[in-house]
Structure formats: C-alpha cells, structure tokens
From Swiss-Prot:
Sites where the protein binds Zn(2+): 277, 341
Gene: thiC
GO biological process: thiamine biosynthetic process; thiamine diphosphate biosynthetic process
Taxonomic superkingdom: Bacteria
Keyword tags: 4Fe-4S, Iron, Iron-sulfur, Lyase, Metal-binding, S-adenosyl-L-methionine, Thiamine biosynthesis, Zinc
Lineage per the UniProt record: Bacteria, Pseudomonadati, Thermodesulfobacteriota, Desulfobulbia, Desulfobulbales
Name assigned to this protein: Phosphomethylpyrimidine synthase
Stored PANTHER family: PHOSPHOMETHYLPYRIMIDINE SYNTHASE, CHLOROPLASTIC (PTHR30557:SF1), THIAMINE BIOSYNTHESIS PROTEIN THIC (PTHR30557)
Amino acid sequence: MTRNLEKKMSIREDAQQGKVTPLFEQCAAVESMSVERLMAGVSDGTIAITKNKNHAFSKVIAIGAGTSTKVNANLGSSKDINSLEEELKKLAVAIKAGADTIMDLSMGGDLQKIRQEILKNCSVPLGTVPIYQVAAEVVAAGKEIVDMTVERMFEVIEQQAKDGVDFMTIHCGINRHLQERLKNQPRTMGVVSRGGSFTLDWMNHHKRENPMYEYFDDLLAILKEHEVTLSLGDGIRPGCLADATDRNQIQELITLGELTERAWAAGVQVIVEGPGHMPLNQIKANVLLQKQMCKGAPFYVLGPLVTDIAPGYDHITGAIGGAIAASAGADYLCYVTPAEHLKLPNCSDVHEGVIASKIAAHAADIVKGLPGAIEKDNAMAKCRKELDWKGQIELSIDPAKSAQYRHEGGGDATDACSMCGEFCALKVFERSQK
C-alpha cells in the first residue's frame, strides 16, 4: 500500500487503488481496526465513510462491516413549527447525547438558511432528503407537489451537495413496475415514506418514470463530484406490522440491490435504508435479505418498531427492534423519539431518542464482539461491586440522568442506594464471606 496525502475526489476509488489517506487512518483508529481492513471494506462497499469534500467537521465516521453500530438523529422544522434557534438547540442536544450523524428533514421556514446553519454548527456528518425541499418550495408557492419539475429536483440535489451535505436519502428504487405492483397488492397503510409518497404522486400525475430511477447516472455524477454518499431510501417501507415483508417491500429491495452495484461502479459510496415497522420474528430475515440482495452494503434501519400500539414510547419499540436488527448485522440505526407518530420532537424527545438508540447499538456491539464493547460493561460491574458511585455515573450512557437519580434518592451521603439501604445484597454478601 502506498502513502498519498493528496485530496482525491472519490473515497471509494482511493480505497480501491490502495492509497492511504488521513481520512482512512482516522476512521481506522476510531474503530480499532487496521487501515488495511477499513480500506478493504470501503473498496468492496461493505463500509461507507460519509464525508462531503465541502464539509469540514471533527467527527469522521465509518459505517458498515466490523465498525461500531452508528446512530442517526433526525432534526428539522415543519410547516407549522419552524424555528432555526430551536433546531440548533436540538442539534446540540443530539450531538451531546452521542448521535453519530444528523439528518436535517426541514420542510418549513427558510430551508436553505436552516440547512446551512445546521451544517455550520454540525460536528458530525449531515444528511438530507432533497425532495423535501423541492416539495416544500412548490407548496409554499401555492402549487401542488405534482408541480415539482425534474430540473428543480436535480438543482436542489446539486446545491445541497455544493453546500456540504454528506449523505442524501433519495428514493431511487421506486419505478413504474413497483407502482403497478402496489396496485395489485394493497396494503393496510399504503406508503408511509414522505419521499416515497411525493415520488409516487408525481409519477401517477405525469404518467412518467421516477426521475431518480430514470436519470440515475446523472444523479451519480453529481454525488461523485462532491463526494456525497447515496443513502438509497426505502420509499415502500412498511408503516405497520401488517405490511411488513410484503412483495412490495421486497421488490423495492431487489431494485435497490441493483442500483447499489451501479453506484459502486460509478465510484459512489452507498448505504441502503430499511424498515420500518416489523414483528420481532421477521427482523433477522430482513437483515439477511438486505445483505444478500445488496452485496453487504451498510444497512440503515428506522427502528425497526416492533409494535404499533405504543405512541409516546416508540423510542422503546424502536430500540428493541434496533438491538435485534443490529445484532443480526444491521450497521446503522435511525433513532425514534417518544414524539414519533404524535408531533414534532422537542429537545427532550431528541435526547431520549438518541439515548434509547445508543443503548440498542451498544447491546448489539457486544453481540458482534466489537473491541471495547463488553469491556465497558465489565468496568461498570466492577464499579457496582465496589459501590463506586462516581465510577458508575461516569461509565453510564447518560451520566447526567444517573447523577440526577442518585441525588434524588438521597445517595450523595451514603454508599448505598435508597432502594436497599442496609439490606444491600452486595454488602450482605461481602460481609458473609469474611
């Protein structure tokens, strides 16, 4: 392998050519793996490094085989609630809680300004869904979503790439064939992906192919120029347990697998998105299907949410599914907040969502046998045995909450807790051994 400090356009091509760069060295160090192994993963597409050449940030990450399970936090304004100040607060909360990436899903207010300010303040990779901006613009102009133009779709993608967006969710897997299949196999909830529904609405109205599928090569050219990772959106993901793993979902996945290989051939890195709502016993099979269909490309799942009846607690339903999915081989969890299905999340919701998904990711990393994962739990066990409360708080996934609960329980002045006090099992056992 050769040493090369020059900035190259394509991270994937650098890896394929065996050119060691500071980016590869930094990611390998974070993941406790050799540079050679990391580069082999980037070369064969099983690892993606989401880093736009126009975005300077401090926390570069690798997503995929052999790396720690990553967590994404979604932010963004809505038409009804659009405060840049609030979104920047959410950004800070998400990053402090441990989010590895951020997605700006804004659809209200000055979208360009919101995105650029988030980019400026974002110390981790930032993703977007460009069709959101296109749809929001036409609606703000008093028109309908179907009035989006192909030209504007590509203009927005290119502008966001130039601004520094690191990865983009684009629903390329929806095509005319899948459109007909949806008519032939009705669903309980139809299509729940906003980007997917916008795309299908446009296709139905214009009787045309999905522009992101039809002009896929043009899309790849833009993404490669700016080193944007393509996150292939699952526009037909199931929105309820009843729709999970149906023919519609799997047909889109087959298409995403084909598009993955085309993107790789063009020198573009790929992440593949997945469900969604899904019963526990279907999650492992879905991960296996994605890994087979998409040749091991990193798998990015929303949850999955394992029940439909827990609004207000969907950060828990999502964490349960996320732990199972990641332990089965999924690489990247999109967080779910307690506000899911109910409202736009606030700062508290964002914090709770990130922590829940970080717990799921860590639990999966233990199963994956990743370096340093179980060691954290072993260190916690040692602190608990020794009643080292300071150590326990420092090791916890949410130190502030641990400290708060300890204080509220009156534990500051004792080595026990208010649950057991003098009946502490650890103390009794220790005494019995003397």
